[in-house]
Amino acid sequence: MVPKLFTSQICLLLLLGLMGVEGSLHAKPGQFTWAQWFEIQHINMTSGQCTNAMQVINNYQRRCKNQNTFLLTTFADVVHVCGNPSMPCPSNTSLNNCHHSGVQVPLIHCNLTTPSRRISNCRYTQTTANKYYIVACNNSDPVRDPPQYPVVPVHLDRII
């Protein structure tokens, strides 16, 4: 009985540890609201090259993100998409706070090709396209988000 219980506890701890690691990969840095983090990750492409642009995101997360999509549009335009009819989110159909862009936008998709423990050594390839997108939206943080946007994008759910 003791070895079986001990083994079960070890398995549970390993599972919880893995879930914690997976959860932390999708976590936002604490100093940002979800809308601010969305803007950093998906709107503010600080450089025309993925390798340079991804360093900003990677520095906040302290790891090299495997892939990321930058929408070449404005935050205000994505906020406007939040006004489109709600739909179930493709990545989690139990959530009904997603909205289809309705128009294609230019975008750049960054894909990690050279991983490294040292963030500055990570390298990315980039692909450009014009595609629709689906974004999840929530009520804004009344203190830290721009007051003109009561509902804001918080997650890029799908590119189509």
UniProtKB/Swiss-Prot annotation:
Signal peptide extent: 1-27
Keyword list, A-Z: Disulfide bond, Endonuclease, Glycoprotein, Hydrolase, Lyase, Lysosome, Nitration, Nuclease, Signal
Entry-linked Gene3D superfamilies: Ribonuclease A-like domain
Reactions accelerated catalytically: an [RNA] containing cytidine + H2O = an [RNA]-3'-cytidine-3'-phosphate + a 5'-hydroxy-ribonucleotide-3'-[RNA]; an [RNA] containing uridine + H2O = an [RNA]-3'-uridine-3'-phosphate + a 5'-hydroxy-ribonucleotide-3'-[RNA]
Enzyme Commission number, as recorded: 4.6.1.18
Glycosylation sites: 34, 44, 92, 111, 138
UniProt-listed CDD domains: RNase_A_canonical
GO cellular component terms attached to this protein's record: extracellular space; lysosome
UniProt enzyme class: lyase
Subcellular location: Lysosome; Cytoplasmic granule
Disulfide links within the chain: 50-110, 64-122, 82-137, 89-98
Predominant subcellular localization, coarse grouping: other
Active-site residues, as the UniProt record annotates them: 42, 155
Residues that bear 3'-nitrotyrosine: 60
Free-text function comment from the UniProt entry: This is a non-secretory ribonuclease. It is a pyrimidine specific nuclease with a slight preference for U. Cytotoxin and helminthotoxin. Possesses a wide variety of biological activities.
Assembly description: Interacts with and forms a tight 1:1 complex with RNH1. Dimerization of two such complexes may occur.
Protein name as annotated: Non-secretory ribonuclease
Designated gene of the protein: RNASE2
